[in-house]
Regions:
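Short secondary-structure boundary/hinge segments and terminal tails
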Residues: 94, 124, 244, 340-341
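Acidic/polar residues at beta-strand termini and the immediately following turn/coil
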Residues: 16, 58, 118, 139, ...
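Aromatic-rich beta-strand edge motifs centered on tyrosine
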Residues: 1, 10-20, 31-41, 52-62, ...
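A generic structural signal for beta-strand entry/edge sites
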Residues: 123, 202, 222, 293, ...
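Beta-turn initiation residues at beta-strand->coil junctions
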Residues: 2-8, 23-29, 43-53, 65-71, ...
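A motif-centric feature for acidic-aromatic and gly/ser/thr-rich catalytic loops and repeats
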Residues: 103, 157-173, 284, 289-355
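Short, solvent-exposed loop/turn segments that connect beta-strands within catalytic domains
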Residues: 92-99, 141, 241-246, 266, ...
């Protein structure tokens, strides 16, 4: 694909002899370039000739080192090829490096993640049943402890380990979860969730003929979503009481990956991923208006690709969080007003609804 016309403008792409994408020019005129070495593996990403990251690889072409501003991230693998350690450190050449974060991972013989060790948030242990379903998680981060049980069809049940079984927490009729730990759900004839009621209030959902969610109504207001022909969300809007949209956020896509978002306050964020085929974020480049300078922010991710910290080019933390098992955050913090909405790979948090 050489050219892609989207609701937010035209993207153009260039490729080398091995069909590796070497450049993408975005509608705002900025160009992201990928440099490869002889075997066709990624060596550098730059934006308008400004280096975003450089990569060093081992004899198997696995990434073992990347630059992220004044920080560098080193990766180590176990004999099975699984990531066992990801250490981020600061330090100039000739200076003893200082560890910024250190993440270590342990696995079972069935490739189940058993333990993570995070230098800033402590240890987290995971427990599974014989079929590989997670049954409990214990973390030193905010003392998080949770457990789960399942029915014979694999549906999550509302009761926790050791909790007395009742009709409400032991049965999932027609494989539709009607209630789960204080949250109640209602469905339409297509099996789509049309209402969710919990301690934080009630949300109602409306869909189009393609089963895409196009509107959410909460106690705080109504929000509307616009899609393109490929089902990619191109815009979200807050709807005023008189039915008019405002506070529009627009989304630009590169294939099925979110490439850029433009927020109502005039700031755009360009997302850069660890390689052309990945959904794991590497960096975000913020820009105010057309003439504003680029501000590069770097993602530091867990083994599953979920962002745990963001740093600026000087290596200072601007955002951080931990995660519960299903993706809810633990003690999210922003330092300096940076909002970060990427979660698990391919997921984007709408803060106005919590979805």
């Amino acid at each position: 694909m050489l050219t892609e016309e989207t609701a937010q403008g035209v993207l153009t792409h260039q490729y080398d002899e091995l069909s590796n994408r070497t450049a993408t020019t975005f509608p705002d005129g900025r160009t992201q370039r990928h440099l490869y070495y002889g075997s066709g593996h990624l060596q550098q990403i730059n934006l308008d000739r400004e280096v975003i990251s450089e990569f060093t690889r081992d004899a198997l072409h696995r990434e073992v080192l990347r630059s992220q501003g004044r920080l560098s991230t080193r990766q180590l693998y176990d004999p099975a090829g699984r990531l066992k350690r990801r250490e981020t450190y600061s330090g100039m050449r000739g200076v003893v490096p200082e560890t910024f974060t250190d993440r270590q991972y342990s696995y079972s013989g069935e490739d189940e993640l058993l333990k993570t060790r995070h230098s800033r948030r402590g240890e987290t242990d995971y427990f599974y049943d014989p079929t590989g379903r997670i049954t409990a998680c214990r973390s030193e981060d905010e003392g998080y402890l949770a457990s789960w049980q399942y029915d014979a069809a694999g549906n999550l049940l509302g009761r926790r380990a050791g909790e007395r079984a009742t009709a409400e927490n032991s049965v999932v009729p027609f494989n539709r979860l009607m209630s789960y730990r204080g949250v109640h759900y209602r469905y339409d004839e297509f099996g789509r969730t049309v209402e969710k009621e919990g301690r934080s209030g009630t949300q109602s959902y409306r869909y189009d003929a393609e089963h895409r969610m196009v509107e959410v109504t909460t106690a705080r207001g109504t929000y509307r979503y616009v899609y393109d022909a490929l089902g990619r969300r191109t815009e979200k809007q807050h709807i005023s009481p008189d039915g008019k949209p405002y506070n529009r956020t627009k989304f630009l896509w590169d294939g099925m990956r979110l490439a850029q978002e433009s927020r109502p306050e005039g700031i755009s964020s360009l997302y850069i991923y660890r390689d052309p085929g990945s959904y794991e974020p590497l960096a975000r480049v913020d820009k105010a208006g057309k003439e504003g300078p680029n501000r590069i922010l770097y993602f530091h991710t867990d083994v599953n690709g979920a962002p745990e910290e963001m740093t600026d080019s000087d290596g200072k933390i601007v955002w951080e969080t931990g995660y519960q098992v299903w993706g809810n955050t633990i003690q999210e913090k922003d330092h300096g007003g940076v909002e970060q909405n990427l979660r698990y790979q391919g997921q984007y948090l709408d803060r106005e609804t919590g979805l």
